[in-house]
Amino acid sequence: MESRIRARCPGPVAFVFSGGSSLGALHAGMLRAVHEAGIEPDFLVGTSAGALNAAFMAKGFTAERVRDLARVWTDLSTQDVFPGLGIWNSLRCAIGTGTLASPSGLKRIIERHLPATHAELSIPTAVIASDLATGSAVAFRDGDLRRHVLASASIPGVFPPVAAEGRTFIDGGVSSHVPLLPARDLGAKTMVVFDTGFP
């Protein structure tokens, strides 16, 4: 069965992860099914929550790593992402930065679970963020992985934009919620799509 599935998946094979905020937890179950089917990625592409999941899985597509990803999501709380959440803190953030929340919690999650650079990944990974000036999708493939994932997950109005590579970026889902075109442009012949169905 596994060999028949692989035969129908000409390479390069891209795993494509959609955004979806907390629904990114669904990717763990999808990954388990794909791993059991014996499909292996040549590279990964992710947007927003999917960028975090793609970068996490890029350390190695193993059953243990899939279980670890599920635990990351199971253990995650609202306070982890939005520390000190409350109307007064939100007002202070809105007055200071024009956004509802500080990115400090999201930064800590990223630093806890992801390596610092793309070069430390075992599987090549493209992180999709949206250029604030042009609205276009940009695929980051090398350099500061943590900053790229932070940019990709910076929901407009919730988190402040992120500066990277001399430009300013917001959530990748604004320009490419399911980053099929970036995956195609990077050479994918087969795409295995992990879509949360949101929005």
Regions found by a protein language model. Name each.
Residues M1-T47, A55-P199:
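Patatin-like phospholipase
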